Amino acid sequence: AQQILLDVIGFRGVGITVDSTVANLSGGERQGIAIGRAMHYNADLIVLDEPTAALGVAEVRKVIDFVRKIKQSGRACIYIEHNLAHVHEVADRLVVLDRGRIVSEIIPKDMTVPELTEYLIDLQHKA
C-alpha cells in the first residue's frame, strides 16, 4: 500500500508526503491523487468528467498538467468539459454530443478558441 502511495505522489510531482491527510489537500491535489491512482493501476482509459469544476486557477492548471501527463504516458483519456479553453488546450479530438448523440467531431487545434466557440454556437442554433 505504501508503494502505491509513493507512486501516486511521484506522479503528482509536488510536496505531498505519505503523511499528508486528504482533508489538507486542495481540490486540484485531490483530483491529481485520483488521476495518479488510475495511472498506478495502468488504466488504459481514464475518464475525467468536469475535472476542473469548482477549482481555482492554480488547481485548474494542475489538472490540465495531469491530463498532459496522461497523454504523454500513451493512455487514452476521455475529458468531459464545458470550458472550451481547457478543451482547446488538451484535446486531440472534440466530439460534440446532443442528448447522447454525436452531432459533430472536430480537431480543436484547427481553430482558435473564439472560432471554436462560434462553431459550437452555430451548431447549437442548427439543432
Label the model's feature ranges.
Residues 1-127:
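Glycine-rich phosphate-binding loops of nucleotide-dependent enzymes
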